[in-house]
C-alpha cells in the first residue's frame, strides 16, 4: 500500500516517493517594482549611511525607498552639527554679559539691528524704586562680549510697565517702537515712536503716532502690536489697533522725526512680523504677518494686498524674514506658522506670479516630542536660515535649527534642517536670534534664552558658518547624540542577523577623550542597547562576538564625546557602515504522483471525480491546505497539475481525449509564504 497525503480536505494515494525540495524565495513572487534588494542577498550584506547632511526628521526609511541615496543622509534626531560633509560636535555656546543700569532691572532683549558698524539691541525693564517701565538701547562690544553704551529710549511717567516692540534703521537714524505711557499721559495701551542719531540720546517725534492697541503693556510681556519697515528713505510703522480690530500704517519721511497716518485700514489682529518685500505689482513694499495672513501694503495705491492666507493663529509670523535660498529661483519671504510650519513665498514677477511651499521641519516624520513647537525668531545668512523653535511647554526644549534650503527642491520634502543649539531647560523659549560680526569682525550667532517672564540670558555661537575642515579654531560641546533612521534594508518581512558597524571617523582618542559610543534597537525598540565604542584603533564593533543579533529592522544611535578639558577637540565622522545578513524564510516544494486508478478502487470513487477534485485544488485562488503525512504539519500551497499518465506510465498529452485510460496524475505543490 502506498503513502497517503491530504490536500484540500481530500485524501490522496501517492504512487512511489514524494520528492521534497526548496523553492527559490527571490523568484518573481517578490515584486521588483518595490525595489527590494534581491540582487544583494549574498552571504553578508552591508548598508552605508553617508554623512547625515540632509538634516533631521526621518524616523524610518521606507522599504521601497532603501535605494534612494537621500534617505540615508537623513537622521531622525540630532544634537551634533551635521551641516558639513564631516559631522562634528555642536558649537559650544558662550555667554554674553547683559547690560546693567544702577537702580534699574533690565528684563530682556526684544530685537536688534546693525547701525553704524555696531549691533544694537532694544531692551525693556523697570526703575527699581517705583517699578516704572524703562526701554533701553545697548550696543554689543565684541572684545568683551558685553552689551554696553547706548541710552534710555523711553521712561514711563507714572509707575506702569513699558514694552519694547521693535527697532530699525532709516538713513542715519535709529527708530524704536514702545508700548505704554511714555509721553506724560496715562495712555498705557498706545504705541509710541522714538528716534536717535547715535543710540545714546533719544527724542520724541514732533508728530507722534497715535496707535491705540487696547492692550496695556506688561512687564516682560509679548504683545505683538507694532513693527517697523524701512524702504529707501522712508520708514513705516505697522500698528495693531486691537481695541477696534484694525491695523493701520504710519509713515515718516524724515527719519522718524514726524509721522503721518495712512488712510487705508486693514481689518485684522496682531502684527507678528514685518519686512520689506514685493507686493503684487512687483514693487518693494511693507509686508507683514497678522493672525490670519501675510499682507503687503501698496504704498502707491494706498491699499492692502493679501499674499498668503493662513489658518488663524496668534503665533503666525513670529519668525518672519527675507532670505536668498541657494536652491530657490529668487529671494524668498519666510513666514512661520503657529502649528510649526515654515511657509516659503517666492515672488517671480507679474507674469509668473508666486510660488508657495512648506519648507518647515514638521514634514516627513516631523520632530521628536521634546523638540516640537513653532518658530519664535529667524535670522538669515548667505548659506543657512537660522531659526529658534519650540520650548513652549513643560516637556519641550527650545532649539536653534539651521535650514540649508534643500527642502525647497522637492515639494513635501522636509530635508535640510540641522541642529545648532538646545536650551537644556524645558519651557524656556529662545525668543531672539541675530547673526552679526559687529563690532570686531568675528561672526557670531547671537541668541537669547528666557529664564523667566522678566529675566533672560544672551549667548552666542562663534563662527557658525565655517566648516571644521577649514582649520579655524572653534569650541565644541562636550557631548552630543544622533539617531539614524530605522531601516529594514528593503525587506520588511524577513529577519536579519545584525552583525556589526564600521565608522569612517577620525580625530579619535580613548574613552577619556574623543570617541563615539554606538547603541542600537531592533524592531522599533529605543536604540539604547550598547553596541560598543568607536575609538582610536577600533573603528569596527560587532555583536555577540560576530554572531549578530536577530531582528527585522535596526536603528543606530551615536553618542559623541570629547575630552572634558579641551573644548577645541571633536571627533569627525562621515560614513557609517552596518553589516548584516537578511535570512530569507525557506519555502518548501513537493512533487509526487497521485495513483487515481487504485484510489478509485479503494474508495469506490470514479476516476473522473478524483481528477475533478485535483483540478479544483489547482483552480482555487486561495492557497490549499496540505499535509504530506496525514495528521502532520499543515502547509498552505499553490497546486499545479504537471501531467497525466496512462496505465503503462506513459504521458498523456490531452486529458479529455484519454480520460478512460488515465491511471495517475503528476502534481507540484509549493509554499508561497
Where in this protein do the model-derived segments appear?
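Conserved blade-ending motifs and adjacent loop-strand segments that build the rim/top face
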Residues: 360-376, 408-440
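Short loop/turn motifs that cap or connect beta-strands within the blades
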Residues: 150-158, 207-214, 262-266, 309-311, ...
Amino acid at each position: 500500500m502506498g503513502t497517503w497525503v491530504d490536500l484540500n480536505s481530500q485524501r490522496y494515494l501517492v504512487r512511489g516517493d514524494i520528492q521534497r525540495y526548496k523553492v527559490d524565495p527571490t523568484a518573481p513572487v517578490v515584486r521588483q517594482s518595490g525595489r527590494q534588494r534581491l540582487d544583494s542577498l549574498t552571504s553578508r550584506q552591508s548598508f552605508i549611511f553617508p554623512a547625515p547632511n540632509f538634516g533631521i526628521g526621518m524616523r524610518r526609511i521606507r522599504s521601497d525607498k532603501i535605494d534612494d541615496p537621500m534617505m540615508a543622509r537623513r537622521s531622525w534626531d540630532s544634537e551634533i552639527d551635521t551641516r558639513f560633509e564631516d559631522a562634528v560636535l555642536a558649537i559650544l555656546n558662550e555667554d554674553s554679559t547683559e547690560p546693567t543700569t544702577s537702580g534699574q532691572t533690565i528684563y530682556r532683549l526684544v530685537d536688534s539691528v546693525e547701525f553704524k558698524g555696531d549691533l544694537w539691541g532694544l531692551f525693556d525693564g523697570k526703575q527699581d524704586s517705583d517699578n516704572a517701565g524703562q526701554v533701553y538701547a545697548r550696543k554689543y562690544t565684541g572684545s568683551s562680549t558685553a552689551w554696553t553704551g547706548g541710552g534710555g529710549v523711553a521712561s514711563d511717567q507714572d509707575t506702569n510697565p513699558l514694552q519694547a516692540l521693535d527697532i530699525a534703521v532709516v538713513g542715519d537714524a535709529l527708530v524704536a517702537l514702545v508700548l505704554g505711557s511714555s509721553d506724560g499721559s496715562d495712555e498705557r495701551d498706545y504705541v509710541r515712536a522714538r528716534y536717535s542719531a547715535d543710540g545714546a540720546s533719544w527724542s520724541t517725534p514732533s508728530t507722534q503716532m497715535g496707535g491705540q492697541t487696547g492692550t496695556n503693556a506688561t512687564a516682560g510681556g509679548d504683545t505683538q502690536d507694532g513693527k517697523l519697515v524701512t524702504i529707501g528713505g522712508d520708514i513705516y510703522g505697522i500698528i495693531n489697533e486691537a481695541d477696534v480690530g484694525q491695523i493701520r500704517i504710519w509713515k515718516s519721511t524724515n527719519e522718524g522725526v514726524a509721522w503721518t497716518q495712512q488712510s487705508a485700514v486693514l481689518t485684522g489682529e496682531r502684527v507678528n512680523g514685518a519686512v520689506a518685500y514685493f507686493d503684487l505689482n512687483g514693487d518693494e513694499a511693507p509686508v507683514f504677518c497678522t493672525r490670519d495672513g501675510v499682507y503687503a501694503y501698496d504704498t502707491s495705491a494706498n491699499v492692502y494686498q493679501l499674499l498668503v492666507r493662513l489658518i488663524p493663529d496668534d503665533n503666525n509670523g513670529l519668525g518672519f524674514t527675507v532670505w536668498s535660498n541657494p536652491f530657490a529661483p529668487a529671494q524668498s519671504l519666510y513666514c512661520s506658522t503657529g502649528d510649526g510650519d515654515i511657509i516659503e513665498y517666492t515672488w517671480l514677477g507679474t507674469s509668473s506670479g508666486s510660488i508657495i511651499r512648506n519648507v518647515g521641519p514638521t514634514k516627513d516624520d516631523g520632530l521628536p516630542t521634546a523638540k516640537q513647537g513653532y518658530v519664535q525668531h529667524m535670522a538669515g545668512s548667505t548659506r543657512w536660515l537660522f531659526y529658534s523653535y519650540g520650548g513652549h511647554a513643560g516637556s519641550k526644549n527650545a532649539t536653534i535649527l539651521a535650514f540649508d534650503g534643500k527642502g525647497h527642491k522637492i515639494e513635501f520634502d522636509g530635508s535640510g534642517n540641522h541642529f545648532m543649539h538646545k536650551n537644556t531647560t524645558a519651557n524656556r523659549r529662545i525668543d531672539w536670534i541675530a547673526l552679526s560680526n559687529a563690532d570686531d569682525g568675528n561672526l557670531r550667532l547671537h541668541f537669547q534664552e528666557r529664564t523667566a517672564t522678566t529675566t533672560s540670558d544672551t549667548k552666542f555661537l562663534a563662527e557658525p558658518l565655517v566648516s571644521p575642515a577649514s582649520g579655524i579654531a572653534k569650541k565644541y560641546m562636550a557631548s552630543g547624540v544622533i539617531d539614524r533612521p530605522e531601516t529594514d534594508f528593503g525587506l520588511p518581512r524577513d529577519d536579519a542577523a545584525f552583525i556589526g558597524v564600521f565608522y569612517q571617523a577620525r580625530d579619535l582618542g580613548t574613552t577619556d577623550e574623543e570617541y563615539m559610543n554606538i547603541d542600537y534597537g531592533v524592531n522599533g525598540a529605543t536604540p539604547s542597547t550598547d553596541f560598543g565604542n568607536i575609538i582610536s584603533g577600533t573603528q569596527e564593533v560587532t555583536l555577540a562576538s560576530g554572531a549578530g543579533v536577530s531582528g527585522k529592522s535596526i536603528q543606530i544611535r551615536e553618542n559623541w564625546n570629547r575630552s572634558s578639558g579641551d573644548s577645541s577637540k571633536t571627533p569627525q565622522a562621515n560614513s557609517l557602515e552596518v553589516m548584516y545578513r537578511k535570512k530569507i524564510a525557506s519555502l518548501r516544494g513537493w512533487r509526487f504522483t497521485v495513483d487515481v486508478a487504485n484510489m478509485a478502487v479503494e474508495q469506490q470513487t470514479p476516476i473522473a471525480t478524483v481528477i475533478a477534485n485535483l483540478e479544483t485544488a489547482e483552480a482555487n485562488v486561495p492557497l490549499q491546505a496540505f499535509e504530506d503525512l496525514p495528521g502532520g504539519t499543515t502547509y498552505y500551497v499553490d497546486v499545479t497539475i504537471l501531467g497525466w499518465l496512462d496505465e503503462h506510465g506513459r504521458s498523456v498529452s490531452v486529458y479529455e481525449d484519454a480520460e478512460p485510460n488515465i491511471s495517475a496524475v503528476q502534481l507540484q505543490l509549493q509554499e508561497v509564504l
